[in-house]
Amino acid sequence: MANKALYILAGYDDRTEEILSGIQNKLYDEGFSGLQTRNIPMHFTMGSYAVEQEEELKNRLEKIAETHRAFDTEFNHVGLFRLPENDVLFIAPEVSREMLALKDEFSDNRDQFNWSPHTTMLIDKPAVIQEATQSVLKKFTSFSGKVAVLHLYEFWPTRHILSVQLAD
């Protein structure tokens, strides 16, 4: 249980999910595999919490979903993060007032890094990410999307706990 944690993920409407998944699936079709968690919705992480907070977080998400509305966002750039052994290729939603207001609901998280909303496409060695980045950049054009759902997950192993739709 020491390595387990709960994560709040901000997810997208079906159209945005389809666009982002399509980009990632093209990478898979080209032979890239990566180390990122699979079979979870496209998202950006709002924060991590201790597993003992599960009931509290479930209640909190239900309340937040009633008070925060789904909101539009623009995806206008591809980016990279450097990790100790790997790099992360991502597509980032543009930060907005609505996104920051939602993030404020999770200011008590235990994350060790500064928050930078991003949707991971691939995690792998730097040379692999460099090649994958070129592939994504050849086809990427900015697009509009919508943040519409909050998910609560436990990792590792992956366990979906709850998903709540933001108000319309």
Annotate each predicted stretch with a short phrase.
Residues M1-D72, P93-K146, H160-D168:
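Basic, often amphipathic N-terminal segments
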Residues N76-G79:
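Substrate/cofactor-recognition hotspot
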Residues N86-V88:
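Charge-rich, low-complexity N-terminal segments
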Residues H151-W156:
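Short, exposed beta-strand-loop hairpins at the edges of beta-sheets
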